[in-house]
Structure formats: C-alpha cells, structure tokens
Amino acid sequence: MTEVVPSSALSEVSLRLLCHDDIDTVKHLCGDWFPIEYPDSWYRDITSNKKFFSLAATYRGAIVGMIVAEIKNRTKIHKEDGDILASSFSVDTQVAYILSLGVVKEFRKHGIGSLLLESLKDHISTTAQDHCKAIYLHVLTTNNTAINFYENRDFRQHHYLPYYYSIRGVLKDGFTYVLYINGGHPPWTILDYIQHLGSALANLSPCSIPHRIYRQAHSLLCSFLPWSSISTKGGIEYSRTM
C-alpha cells in the first residue's frame, strides 16, 4: 500500500475480529513487519481459535493493523517470565500476553497502534474484569521503535532474555515488557520493603511509635531466633512471600 495517508485517517479506521479468510493477508503483513517466520498452524489459530483476541484495524476495507493477544491464567506463563506477578496473587489470576501488534508502514504515527492497544484493554475489562493483573510481551532488544512505543504507554522492561529469538538461524536477544493493571505488581524487592516501611512510619502518630517499634523489633527477633521463649500479648503474626 503506497497511497498518501491523510492526517484524518484514524477517523476512517474500523475495527473487526480476524477470520479465516484473512489468513493470506495476515501472512503477507507479518512477513513485512516481523523477522520471525510463523508456521501455518499459527495463522490458523489466531484467525479461528477463540482463545485469542485477534483484532484488525481496517481502512476503506483493507487491513492496516492488527493485534493478537491471549488472556490466560498466570500458571500458564512460560518459565522465563514466571515472576511477572508476585506469588501472593492466586493461581487463577490472569495475565494478557501480546503475541503480535503491527501497523502498515504508511499508517504508522496515526494512532492506530494506540487504538489497537486500548481496544485490548477494553476487551480485558469486559471479559476478565479486574482478574487480569498484567499485560506483557516480548520484543527484540534492537527494535527501538517498538520499545519506545511501549515505554511511552507505561510498559516497563522486566527481563533481559539472551538468545531468546532464532531468526534465520541466528540467535537474537529479547526483552520482556510488562504493563501492570488492576493492582498487579511484581515480587517485592528489598527496596520496596524499605519504602513500604518508611511510608508506614511516616503515617504513625508520635505516641504510638515506641510501642510499634518494640512490636516490630520483637517480631524480627523471633524470626531470627525461633527457639526464643520471649512472648508478648501484642505480638504480630505475618507471612512472607517471595
């Protein structure tokens, strides 16, 4: 497609789900957009299997962009991304994985990519509601255009994945990027615990500080000395998650 795209193109863009008849078009587009070769079964799945959210952006009847994502339980996250969510979230907590997001070159920078991403968020809020806690994806470390797109929309780098991709027989590095939603968050680091403690102390009234410090110190002592016979009526019980 080589026509000049008007600045008002977004107002003429329509959205619809991909279907089996789109396979040839989607193959051609993915060949232009991505260096990875997908098997025919992948194209059949994303255009027919209801577990995928496969949305096309069309302009005057032609597909000019698409997003493919899967909403799944956190237990189905692959090992390399297993720590996307803190272990405190239940096993039926859901995540959304973006398999593909692309826009025809002439239509880039017209808001179509953002429209597709926002449509995925709307779909999540309708189907998964607040049970979905994160949206994540993988990207080549050299794909600065995509990285800037996601970072400008509040996605944050979570993992560096050496040799994650095999492109025409050459191994390439990747990143995992994550957007947390509905209160989702990664496992806490030591810095997070320190910041949480500082916030809690800032909210204490002066008169309660000595007693609370004693209780926290007692709890800490017991965690290091489980054989200790020290006891207190006001002791704190807590569990630690990793």
From Swiss-Prot:
Binding site for acetyl-CoA: 101-103, 109-114, 143, 150-153
Record's comment on post-translational modification: Acetylated: autoacetylation is required for optimal acetyltransferase activity.
Region (Required for homodimerization): 162-173
Gene it is expressed from: Naa60
Catalysed transformations (reactions): N-terminal L-methionyl-[transmembrane protein] + acetyl-CoA = N-terminal N(alpha)-acetyl-L-methionyl-[transmembrane protein] + CoA + H(+); L-lysyl-[protein] + acetyl-CoA = N(6)-acetyl-L-lysyl-[protein] + CoA + H(+)
Domain of life from the UniProt record: Eukaryota
Residue numbers of N6-acetyllysine PTMs: 79, 105, 109, 121
Domain N-acetyltransferase: 13-182
Function, in words: N-alpha-acetyltransferase that specifically mediates the acetylation of N-terminal residues of the transmembrane proteins, with a strong preference for N-termini facing the cytosol. Displays N-terminal acetyltransferase activity towards a range of N-terminal sequences including those starting with Met-Lys, Met-Val, Met-Ala and Met-Met. Required for normal chromosomal segregation during anaphase. May also show histone acetyltransferase activity; such results are however unclear in vivo and would require additional experimental evidences.
InterPro entries to which the protein is assigned, alphabetical: Acyl_CoA_acyltransferase, GNAT_dom, NAA60-like
Protein name: N-alpha-acetyltransferase 60
